[in-house]
Amino acid sequence: MKSRTRVVVIGGGIAGCSTLYHLTQEGWSDVVLIERNELTSGTTWHSAAQVTNFGMNQTMVGLKTHSINLYKKLSDDPDYPINYHHGDGGIRLANTEEQMQGYRHFASMARGMDVHFEIIDAEEC
């Protein structure tokens, strides 16, 4: 086992694996990932793995859009097949006017980021 390395990533969940992946894509080779059990066997394994573009600021929308595109790219690699399906759609409910204002803000921001987001009222459901 190595006793020295440039980067140690602790945890083999989605965050740790993603960090290691992106470091290697940037050309880093002296990196090690440490996981106490099997990769993705903790919280990541229990996740429903729902990835949406929804986020209340441009940074989060951009990060989520990048993730969706990355998972699609990874699923197309015949050497490392993963089972990935990205469906279109979702439902979020507003119980207060404050929540509704948040959704209106997101809808306005989403239009500028090429993310489809539609607000419907109770009668349209």
Predicted regions: what they are:
Residues 1-2, 25, 85:
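Short, flexible hinge/linker loops that cap or flank conserved catalytic cores
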Residues 16-19, 47, 67:
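Short N-terminal amphipathic alpha-helix/helix-capping patch enriched in small hydrophobics
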Residues 40:
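Short glycine/proline-centered loop/turn elements that form peptide/ligand docking sites
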Residues 49-124:
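Dinucleotide-binding Rossmann-like beta1-alpha1 core, especially the glycine-rich loop
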